[in-house]
Regions:
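Domain-scale recognition of functional cores that engage charged ligands
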Residues: 2-217
Length: 217
């Protein structure tokens, strides 16, 4: 199990009893050796966004291989030259707190006011290790059922698709993925904690999609 939620919400039997996010009994199963937890309780290395920038180096070091998929360019403001690049180009970047999750604290440069950008630069200078920055990616839009002034309407909303790779005896890419949608109009933040949602992802079998009688099947 890859843990992404905070320790306190992981298991209502062991931590916060009011947690609706965790799995009752998970800590007992973990201690008994019946399940493995990546990003184990008490550790937070997988939650640190700065680590992402070193993933290609980790692959080379631990696997002695070259990454097959390139990383999104990630600027670590802990390094003076990268910090200066972020400051000089902040209007074209998205700045993220290194240890926040759920979309909190994110500043999207081309959608922020000058005051917000200046405040972000000041916070970066005060805590260089606490931030990373990446280019702003263009998200696709899909027709989405939304509420407009109390009435249902279909309007475009930004989405991202997250495919997953499962590894057991063999490794494979799942046919489909998690589609997250930014429900506030114009928003690029798809996190549910920021008002985002999810959508079904349908993968059409090419054999059926090209058949003249596909609609009858």
């Amino acid at each position: 199990i890859y843990r992404r939620i905070d320790d306190l919400f992981l298991d209502p039997e062991a931590f916060r009893p009011d947690s609706m996010l965790g799995v009752p009994g998970l800590m007992r199963a973990w201690k008994a050796g019946n399940v493995a937890l990546a990003n184990a309780p008490g550790a937070g290395v997988a939650d640190d966004k700065v680590v992402y920038a070193w993933v290609p180096d980790m692959i080379r070091y631990y696997l002695d291989e070259e990454p097959l998929i390139p990383n999104v360019p990630t600027y670590r403001t802990m390094y003076p030259d990268e910090m200066q690049h972020v400051i000089d180009n902040i209007g074209d970047l998205v700045v993220k707190p290194a240890n926040e999750s759920g979309g909190y604290g994110i500043v999207i440069g081309n959608r922020a006011t000058r005051d917000e950008l200046d405040d972000t630069i000041a916070r970066i200078r005060a805590d260089p290790r606490g931030f990373v920055a990446q280019p702003i990616l263009s998200l696709s839009t899909v027709p989405t059922l939304v509420d407009v002034d109390g009435q249902p309407a279909v309007e475009p909303r930004h989405v991202d698709l997250r495919p997953f790779i499962l590894t057991g005896e063999y490794s494979y890419v799942t046919p489909g993925g998690l589609t997250r949608v930014a429900l506030p109009k114009g928003s690029l933040v798809v996190n549910s904690s920021q008002g985002g949602g999810s959508k079904d992802t349908w993968v059409i079998d090419s054999m059926f999609s090209t058949s003249p009688n596909a609609g009858e099947r």
